[in-house]
Amino acid sequence: MNTILKVDDINVYYGSIHAIKGISFEVGEGEVVTLIGANGAGKSTTLNTIAGLLRSKTGSIEFMGQSLAKVPSHKIVAKGLALVPEGRRVFLQMTVQENLEMGAFTQKNAGIAQDLEMVYDLFPRLKERLKQTAGTLSGGEQQMLAMGRALMSHPKVLMLDEPSMGLAPILVEQIFEIIQNLHKAG
């Protein structure tokens, strides 16, 4: 198994609060990995640190054999590592299509239309709402939009932070079915 992501002894602080204490793990190519812990255990902080939104005081993070120590978050996305943040965090005043296009900032214009179709195939509901502003979507639709936006960057690793938070059980089932299908598709 090839290691695609390696997190080694990272320590993250919020001011004087030691939020992440020496966490280490590896993700192999093709693996699905879950971070499990109580509220406040540091799961979101860990994902945000890997994505370059926070910095570790010590330790290292390597993606595909390259250090991410001083790499800005937008370049981490361009390398193939995308985060779907907790709470969806879509651009509420922008349309569905505009939100998806924001996720394609790493792509050349020629491929964006094809990428949009790929996302619309995964999430047909988004195609029905492509001109609608994201703020008017349901929670489940916003989660689909956040996932679709991340997929527009062609990630090699897709990190999902609380993908089922606040969703009805039927929507949770749909989201996890899509995650399984993405895993099978590679």
What are these regions (language model features)?
Residues N2-G186:
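Glycine-rich phosphate-binding loops of nucleotide-dependent enzymes
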